[in-house]
């Protein structure tokens, strides 16, 4: 961008009579001022007045162009063109949307890389509006598209004001859109203010202009850069912006949390099942070892029992033989004893007989001696 003296002068009017101007009594000079007031609140400082003559005097131009003028209450009812949903979710543009994932900080409300695109239906007013549209486009990190009511051409009006004035200074007033509508994306970086061909290029912080889609509505918050996209803007249209769109709705985060909890439960169940399976396997192996030890001990006891049974059988056989031997040896011992007893008994009987005989002989002798007379009588009688 160069100084105001370097800007091309508009061609002088010819002497031919021009057509009578169209009556523009009800047309506002700033067609999108109400939309801007709806989007800006007391938290965001509005740019001051910009005088192009200051650039010619050698002073650096201020970053803003006009002072704030509150035409509507900042916390009033939301503007229908900006908040088509009625303001139920987004009560004010300064309020962040939803909750962020854990471990991340809240993005700033407004950062130098913010891109605002507001399209409201306006009417084309010829060269006057065209000139105003060219001058009201440069902000310090806040790029706002000012269109003529066509939503498909609203985001294509992000142009550098000085370059557009150099290239489109002589366009007719029938169309309120600036040239370069086919430019889909515009990248700006705030790395410095280089000069090229004696013209100072004021570069704002990096932002990407995106074109709104016809079906999408609502305001989307870009995570990381703190940018608020206009209604219907798709952030996937730029590959550089797709990386910063990590903001996920709370329902998705809740679903992800449920899935993570479910996976943790499944993993814990698998681990517990594996531990129980290993414990049961260890118990089974220990029981198998005990069974083997008990079976071996049982076999040893059975073998000892068999040996004891064999020994008992042998002892029984020996006892039987001894009993038989005892039975055979008892009669031989009794015969001599009987013989001796008989001998003794017979000796005593003989003595008794001899003694009785002797007694009878003596008595008979006594009788004979005593009975001599009766015998003689008997003999005499006989």
Curated annotation (Swiss-Prot):
Residues 259-322 form the bZIP domain. Residues 261-280 are annotated as: Basic motif. Residues 166-181 have a biased composition (Low complexity). CDD domains: bZIP_plant_GBF1 (cd14702). Pfam families: bZIP_1, MFMR, MFMR_assoc. One of its GO terms (biological process) is response to abscisic acid. Residues 287-322 are annotated as: Leucine-zipper. Present only in dark grown leaves and roots. One of its GO terms (molecular function) is sequence-specific DNA binding. Residues 1-16, 155-165, 182-199 have a biased composition (Basic and acidic residues). InterPro entries: bZIP (IPR004827), bZIP_plant_GBF1 (IPR045314), bZIP_sf (IPR046347), GBF-like (IPR044827), MFMR (IPR012900). The keyword DNA-binding applies. The keyword Signal does not apply. DNA-binding heterodimer. Interacts with GBF4. Interacts with BZIP16 and BZIP68. This is G-box-binding factor 3.
């Amino acid at each position: 961008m160069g100084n105001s003296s370097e800007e091309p002068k508009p061609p002088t009017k010819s002497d031919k009579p021009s057509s009578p101007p169209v009556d523009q009594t009800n047309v506002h000079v700033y067609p999108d001022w109400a939309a801007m007031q709806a989007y800006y609140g007391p938290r965001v400082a509005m740019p001051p007045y910009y005088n192009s003559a200051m650039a010619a005097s050698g002073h650096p131009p201020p970053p803003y162009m006009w002072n704030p003028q509150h035409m509507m209450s900042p916390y009033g009812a939301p503007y229908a063109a900006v908040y088509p949903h009625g303001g139920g979710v987004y009560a004010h543009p300064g309020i962040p949307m939803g909750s962020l994932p854990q471990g991340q900080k809240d993005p700033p409300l407004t950062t130098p890389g913010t891109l605002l695109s507001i399209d409201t239906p306006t009417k084309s007013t010829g060269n006057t509006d065209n000139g105003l549209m060219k001058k009201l486009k440069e902000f310090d990190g806040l790029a706002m598209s000012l269109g003529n009511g066509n939503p498909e051409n609203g985001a294509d009006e992000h142009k550098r004001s000085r370059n557009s004035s150099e290239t489109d200074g002589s366009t007719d007033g029938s169309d309120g859109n600036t040239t370069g509508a086919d430019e889909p994306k515009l990248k700006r970086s705030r790395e410095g203010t280089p000069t090229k061909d004696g013209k100072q290029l004021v570069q704002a912080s990096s932002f990407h202009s995106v074109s709104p889609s016809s079906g999408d509505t609502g305001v989307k918050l870009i995570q990381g850069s703190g940018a608020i996209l206009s209604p219907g803007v798709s952030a996937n249209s730029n590959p550089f912006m797709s990386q910063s769109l990590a903001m996920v709705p709370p329902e998705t985060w809740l679903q992800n949390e449920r899935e993570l909890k479910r996976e943790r439960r499944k993993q814990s169940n698998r681990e517990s099942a594996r531990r129980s399976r290993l414990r049961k396997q260890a118990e089974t192996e220990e029981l198998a070892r005990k069974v083997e030890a008990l079976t071996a001990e049982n076999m040893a006891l059975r073998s000892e029992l068999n040996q004891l049974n064999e020994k008992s059988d042998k002892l029984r056989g020996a006892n039987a033989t001894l009993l038989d031997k005892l039975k055979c040896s008892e009669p031989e011992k009794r015969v001599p004893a009987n013989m001796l007893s008989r001998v003794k008994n017979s000796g005593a009987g003989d003595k008794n007989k001899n003694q009785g005989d002797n007694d009878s002989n003596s008595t008979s002798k006594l009788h004979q001696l005593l009975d001599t007379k009766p015998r003689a009588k008997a003999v005499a009688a006989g």
